[in-house]
Amino acid sequence: VTIGKEGTLT
């Protein structure tokens, strides 16, 4: 998973 700049986990 990666952490996007909005703070969401994808």
Swiss-Prot record:
UniProt remark on cofactor binding: Binds 4 Cu cations per monomer.
Record EC number: 1.10.3.2
Signal peptide span: none
Name used for this protein in its record: Laccase
Location in or out of the cell: Secreted
UniProt record, GO biological process: lignin catabolic process
Cofactor: Cu cation
Protein source organism: Lepiota magnispora (Mushroom)
